[in-house]
Amino acid sequence: MLGLSSFFSGQDEKKYPYTVYLSCNETLQGFLSKQVFDSVIQYPLCAKDSLKQTYQVQSFDMTYAERGLYQDSSGLPIVFTDYSQAQFTGNQFSPQWIRSFRERSYRGDTVYIENVKVLGPDNKSHACKGLKVIIR
């Protein structure tokens, strides 16, 4: 039973030396209004260390969880989530995804930015803590 308690305590959570941010702004995470999300999604991502030094993002993966209202077989409404994934080289979303977010994103949708690679001060690629944004 002791093994399970340490599993759920979060002690084994990986520590990252860098954290990724939208538009290099530390306040743009968690819940964002659609208006704010649409305005910052066009800007590059950046990463920062614990000393707030900025580093260049080399690549990242994105998962977009788009919630929609559908009808089940008996005509009752149900909320269903469609998942889209993309990989990006560099520090920006593609123009197609920026346009898609602006046209399709809605309250309750979630964007996950994961598997972020950062160019560190040693000119080597490092893993970076990802980001989760929920549109409200």
Locations of regions flagged by a protein language model:
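Beta-strand/loop-dominated core regions that host nucleotide or nucleotide-derived cofactor-binding catalytic loops
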Residues: D12-R136
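Bacterial Sec-dependent N-terminal signal peptides
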Residues: M1-K15
